[in-house]
Amino acid sequence: MLPAVTLRRSTVAKRYYCHRNRCAYLCKLVEGERFMNLFFDSKLDDDGRREELYRGSIFVYSPSSSALKLCEFARELVEAAFAPNDPQKVQDRLPVERCVEILADLKPKFIHHSKSKELIQGMLAERGCDLSKTYFDVPRLRTAFPSDYLSSGIAYAFHPHRDTWYSAPFSQINWWMPVYDVCPDNIMAFHPRYWKDAVVNSSNTYNYYQWNRMSRQNASQHVKADTRVQPRAQVSVEQEPHLRVVASVGGAMLFSAAHLHSTVQNTCGVTRYSIDFRTVHLDDVWNRCGAPNIDSASTGTTMHDYLRGSDFTHLPDDAISLYFDGTEAEFIPSPSGAPRPSR
């Protein structure tokens, strides 16, 4: 059975199970007169898939060989780091300060490990990406603890946001998958009404280069509360209706960086571990294709972070320069894969 889709409005929840012999299946969720398309195990090629993603569609795929291996590798690291404790129950066993210490060592180890990059390379090939033109940033290992334990700093629980508020290009595609089984109450939520509706926000105060220089390195210092300045909605965001996709371990969900989404408050009693990474396609970078800019005003660019799928080299300098905005003098080269927001 393919992933469950939950569309919530007020106190009413409807769940749709989409299968049909694991073939491509399109489910349209209606909000007013608007549609959000969900593709399950789609046979679209990468060009067609990116076009749909830039229109706000979401793609979900069953677990693939490389994706399962990446999740297995992540579990090996997680379980070794937290041994002898159950990683999904560490909130019941460890002081939060000790947990933060472990994560501060664990997460970079996963992010920068050569095996992580190699398995991402395999995932991209399995999903029909042209490795000579598809660039990715290194995968992040995310944690979402029960909200009364740790939800700041290195385990930040994200408020409703678009990744484009954080200087991501509009051609960026986000890939997300769970490492252990998840439930609707410890994943992430999309807020589909805002795909075309602007949200007054403070993204104009965010510069990616400044973030890397001043705020990125000290995430583990923010244990009780996170005081780092991040772009936020400056008006109340209607949380409902919202969409949650409950994927299988190694099942990948793809969506545009322009989607408004948030971390679901973890009320299921177990810690969620997930992996995410981002891709851009060279043709779209050159042509400045992508999702529409509804309300993003951040400066700087994350274009320096992406690695080519075929050989792990960076984007060409002249392609990156297309995204300069006058703040590039503040750019300080850093290890590829500086952490950026996601669940």
Regions found by a protein language model. Name each.
Residues M1, V5-G128, I320-R343:
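N-terminal auxiliary "cap/dimerization" subdomain that precedes the catalytic jelly-roll/cupin core
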Residues E52-Y54, S62-F82, V246-L254, A258-L260, ...:
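Elongated scaffolding segments in large macromolecular assemblies
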Residues G122-A189:
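Conserved double-stranded beta-helix
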Residues P160-T164, Q239-L243, S262:
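Short secondary-structure capping micro-motifs at structural edges
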Residues D185-S256:
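Double-stranded beta-helix
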Residues H259-R343:
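Non-heme Fe(II)/2-oxoglutarate
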